[in-house]
Amino acid sequence: GGLPKVEDFEDHMDILCNWSLSTGKKLHVHVDQLNCSTEEETKMLCEHTFKYGLEGMVTAVHSISLAAHEKSYRNDVYKMCQDADMSFVSCPSAWIDHPRKEDKMVFHNAVTPADELLRHGISVGIGSDNINDIYKPFSDGSMMLELRFLLETNKVYDVNQLIKIAIDNGKKIIGI
């Protein structure tokens, strides 16, 4: 997996994408984690997916900031994600403790906009981040808790869709 925020995004992504090409392995990249409209890493990840011909090989983890953008921007990114056959992993409790900010942005929950991604036919899986670490010392990695956060924050109440998120899409995302 990658975390381009901590380094130069372009250099980091070039290394990851070249590695994926040389090994044939899928990429899982943590992007748009800060819940702000100035982040555009999901879009940049799509651009790198196209640049390297990695369609169907890339998963965006988090993409919380995508929800902070205007609907027209989100729809443009969703179209790019469809064309890139990109998938997403939502870690709903990872940013639930997001501190208040004075920034003006679209009102939204601090989670991956899974409801919109699903409406655009984009695969969404469930995950957990920061398990029993310095950031989330009481997080135990419960996928049921994460799924509950996802269904409540995105109002995804279709049981068949939730099963698909928890099982089928998860298997697809990790390549089994």
Where on the chain are the PLM-derived regions?
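Short, basic, glycine/proline-bearing loop/turn elements
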Residues: 62-64, 92-101
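Short Asp/Glu-rich motifs
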Residues: 38-40, 100-101, 136-137
